[in-house]
Amino acid sequence: MNLKLQLKILSFLQFCLWGSWLTTLGSYMFVTLKFDGASIGAVYSSLGIAAVFMPALLGIVADKWLSAKWVYAICHTIGAITLFMAAQVTTPEAMFLVILINSFAYMPTLGLINTISYYRLQNAGMDIVTDFPPIRIWGTIGFIMAMWVVSLSGFELSHMQLYIGAALSAILVLFTLTLPHIPVAKQQANQSWTTLLGLDAFALFKNKRMAIFFIFSMLLGAELQITNMFGNTFLHSFDKDPMFASSFIVQHASIIMSISQISETLFILTIPFFLSRYGIKNVMMISIVAWILRFALFAYGDPTPFGTVLLVLSMIVYGCAFDFFNISGSVFVEKEVSPAIRASAQGMFLMMTNGFGCILGGIVSGKVVEMYTQNGITDWQTVWLIFAGYSVVLAFAFMAMFKYKHVRVPTGTQTVSH
């Protein structure tokens, strides 16, 4: 099989299995299993708990002892088993435990798939910068397609979404076994555990600007978790109104939500221009403003014609909110730190956004939703306005505290890291 096609299938399956349940599990737990907001928040925070340390730990295993191919296959085997078990779970405590174990297995694969892809491309004499992005985009396509399949199959509120995820995980394991062997690098054999775990990057907190940047990374990472947890659940809440129960938005909430991912792929293309023209601080400010709009538009959106326009606009600005912080933030880290700790600093950035930010967003937003839910009815407008208010506070705090003087460079020389 052609190398690029092989890696495209790998990326497609990696994110297709995640897309089958990540944005709809909250709806299934809230509507079908009747979990409260705090319980749902706890389940989703498990992704953050796993993201704090598991990628680094299994990255070390793949670097020093066991081929990345086999670590990757073992992780997805565990993932298939736990998703199969999750489909049969009906209590918050059991769901938290099963999804936590699943997260321990899945989160490291986000880095391992890059390791596998980079090695194969470099071994074939290809350029990662030019050849990898067109491969990675198939991951986003897979995520979107899974959302559509689950929605059109009527499984958004069903445990069947988890069976689909388990089946896709099993298929991915079998496909991984067909890949060529990837040798253990052993390049880090003489490094200390402190260096291997990326703990050297904690020294960056001595730099005031970097410390502020990482703290805001966590606070903004929390906003992404809010969307993953409750966006789909919110759209399904309109089925309690007879006027909206049969509307396309309620019946196929995942398809509407997938506009967010489509927008994300388009906004990536604008990052080089905005970074070179306006600088990291202004680009990140645009991201925070986009989060304000994301939540405010949700607050006033509904399945009416005008409300639908507001909901679609909310999905579109999500692409800006996500990319202008996550991608631009990665570029900022790349340019600000010394080459010696660049990889550790990138790991720190991911730890703050996908780890601690995920935990914070899961716990706090779950409590907010629980607080404004009475007799199974959630006051979503108030909930979204609270999150929008949180974003407004972040915007003013970021503007006042983060100091950065931009030196404009030609667009063509701006490097964007994916």
From Swiss-Prot:
- GO CC terms for this protein? plasma membrane
Keywords of this entry: Cell inner membrane, Cell membrane, Membrane, Symport, Transmembrane, Transmembrane helix, Transport
Pfam families, A to Z:
Nuc_H_symport
Q: From which domain of life does this come? A: Bacteria
Q: List the catalysed reactions.
A: adenosine(in) + H(+)(in) = adenosine(out) + H(+)(out); uridine(in) + H(+)(in) = uridine(out) + H(+)(out); thymidine(in) + H(+)(in) = thymidine(out) + H(+)(out); cytidine(in) + H(+)(in) = cytidine(out) + H(+)(out)
Q: Which residues form a coiled coil?
A: none
What CDD domains does the entry give?
MFS_NHS
Residue ranges annotated as transmembrane are 5-29, 37-58, 68-88, 92-113, 136-156, 159-178, 210-236, 248-268, 281-300, 306-326, 347-369, 380-403
- What InterPro entries is this protein classified in? MFS_dom, MFS_trans_sf, Nuc_H_symport, NupG
Q: Name the family the entry cites.
A: Belongs to the major facilitator superfamily. Nucleoside:H(+) symporter (NHS) (TC 2.A.1.10) family.
Q: What is this protein called?
A: Nucleoside permease NupG
What species does this protein belong to?
A: Escherichia coli (strain K12)
